[in-house]
Amino acid sequence: MGYAAVPPVERGSCSAGANNRDITFDFVKGILIILVVLGHLLQLVIYRNTDNFWLSPYFKAIYMFHMPLFMAISGYLASGTILRTSFCRAVGDRAVQLLIPMLFWCALIETAKLAAFFHFSGVTAGLLDFSRELVGTYWFLWAVLASFLLTKLFAAFNLLSKWILCASAIVIALMPITLSIVPLLRYTYPFFCLGFLFAQTIEEQANTMLRHKSLLMFSCWAVACLCFLDWGRDTYAYNNLVLVHDAQSAKQVLLMFTGSAAAAAVAAQSLFHCWRVLCSTRLARLVAVELGQSTLLLYLVQGAVFRLTDLIQFGELWDGKTRIVVASAIGAAIFGAATAVLWIVNDLGYVSRIIVGAPRRLKRSS
């Protein structure tokens, strides 16, 4: 999610800037980070104080694929680093890129909580609360880092065959560990492997997909639609914990992985097509450059905003229209705040790395 790696050029038809960077994946990431914010707005504002968001078709449509596709893109874009960079440097760079901004924004959350509630329960309790924020609020970044580390370990020992990666994805997905965010890591790791493997066999896959593209996409659409219809509250990894203990739980876990994979494939192909059609328009390039190249910062900002709003009591008596207006305002504020932060710190060297993770490699071309 937060990678600044330059994607390969075979995908897109439009590049940007003097370095001819293909920003196809930036466009896809820009759309996905919008969906991340929309999903949280549905959960924490539109359906606030209820559990009805689990049954929302909009929430379902987003959560079926947005994080799996984000993880697959992370695996795809990280493949070059995993294969060509030394273990210590690759892991160190990725840890610095992700962990330092996480620490900064979690410290900001804790400071805001302390200032708002004027309650300090001691150093030990404060550290425990900080660790919970660090792990829970930004679980996806931990999933990216863990997936990167595990895949890099396989590379370090020359064990990166597709069979070993596929086996590792299955074993990790089925491990009966439900501690903290481990179920979410087990859910997303197979998609990281899928993206990584696709990057290694892009030419072979491209030829196969061109020959059978219509059949493949029809099959993915059909599977995604069927899974959407059968998708329920217990199909989400947050609720089933990716745990198989009987026939019903096995059905839900299988439905979750199958539906997520099919929906992610449909979404990816649809977004690639949108980019090919719209890449010359100002709006599409704004999404790619301003949002897609700032997904790490946007994820950090929205996590902080939603964590703080979750601690405030509001909206009990609001009607639907009021909730939509407030959700729109919060969403706009998130993107506005992230843009302002990036504008302020983008050229400040180490300050930028602490707050943003890494500056964007591409400015908007004139």
Curated annotation (Swiss-Prot):
Its main location: membrane. It holds the Pfam family Acyl_transf_3. GO terms for molecular function: acyltransferase activity, transferring groups other than amino-acyl groups. The keyword Cell membrane applies. InterPro entries: Acyl_transf_3_dom, Nod_factor_acetyltransferase, Nod_factor_Fuc_AcT. The chain crosses the membrane at residues 27-47, 62-82, 98-118, 140-160, 164-184, 212-232, 253-273, 286-306, 324-344. The keyword Signal does not apply. Its EC number is 2.3.1.-. GO terms for cellular component: plasma membrane. Keywords: Acyltransferase, Cell membrane, Membrane, Nodulation, Plasmid, Transferase, Transmembrane, Transmembrane helix. It is a multi-pass membrane protein. It is found in: Cell membrane. Thought to be an acetyltransferase that modifies the fucose of the nod factor. NCBIfam families: fucose_Ac_NolL. Belongs to the acyltransferase 3 family. This is Nodulation protein NolL. It comes from Sinorhizobium fredii (strain NBRC 101917 / NGR234). The gene is nolL.
